[in-house]
Amino acid sequence: MIKTDFDIARLCKKNHFIGILAVLSIICSSLYGQNLNSKQEQKLHQIPHLKKQGTVSQLIVDDKPFIILGGELGNSSFTSLEYMHPIWPKLKKMNLNTVLAPVYWELLEPEEGKFDFDLYDQLINEARKNNLKLVFLWFGAWKNSMSSHAPAWVKIDQKRFPRVKDNKGKSHEILSPFGEENLKADLKAYEALMKHIKEFDGTENTVIMIQTENEIGMLPTARDYHPLANKKFQENVTVELINYLKKNKKVIVPELSERWAKNGFKESGTWEDIFGKNVHTDEIFMAWHYSKYTNSIIEAGKAIYALPMFVNAALNRTDSLPGSYPSGGPLPHIMDVWKAGGPSIDFLSPDFYNPNFKHWCDLYIRQQNPLFIPEHSLDKTAAAKAVYSIGHYGALGFSPFSIEDINDPENEPLAKIYNIIKQLNPLISAYQGLGKIEGVLLDKETPMNVLKMGNYELTVKHSYTLGYEKDSKNETWDMAGAIIIQTAENEFYVGGSGLVITFKNLIKPDLNVGILKVDEGKFESNKWKVIRHLNGDQTHQGRHVRMMYNDYSILRFELYNYD
């Protein structure tokens, strides 16, 4: 029977006639539903897509907001059922709901025009058995700049499939984005993949997003010096990019605006005429052509099966020059070039092996770019950053790399944080983007965050500031993180670890703010269940709300005001 959330008795009591119609409607729907098999029912769902709510974008899966509690597999793990067999249970114990997994061009199309989907069909079935969703990573023309995952028939035919050249004329194992045959072959394989996903998974929706290529960028020079590239570099900057810059002149990111301004905001000319003669111009040139190439792939894929599709970037280091990092990739200082050249790309994502987390997230949310973190170092900061990114930035999700390397999954901090987010998911989904959710990220260098939520100012400090825990005396502090959700004027939920909160009234500063009630609990079937009522020493006699560093928990608290 199809279940309904309506309270039929209450509805009938309120209005007898409407109640009868409601009952008849529900009965008819139920009878009709019984005649549908499960696959037909699933066809009623929209395919996974992005939807705006307030200031954030939400990923909608099976018609509901879905936060990716993910983990990315190591590059070679998804190549056989046998290797994956012991990994699936570990992923479940980690409280993942999504696995980011590569699809390898070399395995998909070992001979030109002959595609083998058997491996991926079997792996999709294994994901279904474990109640896990998949984000496929298309290791096509480029993976970490290189073309190592291109099929052998592409690699050995260098005349047909040209490679990049550096400024000394040396070739590298990187397919040139200026080679038409490179694009045609990559695009054809991608189309075949999307067609098969639609046919095999179009009703189940196990595959919910696609990352197209992986960490695109030019190495070891800032631009490609292949004759095809040199010819394009001498041509005038395309009108398409110029029009984008003119239209968005006041809002393009300052890093790009400054490059354009140095030559007087010219609106026609070669790349060097407009942006100057330097490696930064070389990078802008590559960004344009990489984005156009990738957009062609994504546009073709979406025409077949329009899942959300994105690209990811290897972050550059401070003061490093293009070419010392993958030049022209989807990086924040050239994100407008990617937005102009890649309108079909849903968002640009950072891969984090860089400790300055807040800095890079702040850069990536510009230009209304949704934040998703497909890779993060599998380190002890990952749990805190996961909950912070979802709380503060409204991130679509979080995914540490080489997730299968976890040795003790059930006791892993990330597993505990994912469990908390999973329980809070209905609240997060309801209040995201509406100014009711915040996140905190705390360590010894940043031991305090001050938040304004409704009528209150919340001062959130690392629990080590209390001095109660032995590790508070350490030279460095373990990173703490949490999400805070305001569900009513005086009601809040906080989930995470390692914090202490005090309060002020923003509207009437002369009033004191008291803690009316604090409960520790959990959500079971989306219903709040109290485990402990906290008071006395656990709230410092009503002075604060706290959870110690290793106390991964959810607290519900109410505030009140007094003279």
Q: How would you name each of these model-derived features?
A:
Residues N35-N97:
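N-terminal carbohydrate-binding accessory modules
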Residues G70-T79, P102-Y120, K168-K188, I274-S291, ...:
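The substrate-binding groove and active-site-proximal loops of carbohydrate-active enzymes
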Residues Y83-D157, Y290-I304:
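Aromatic-lined substrate-binding rim segments of carbohydrate-active enzymes
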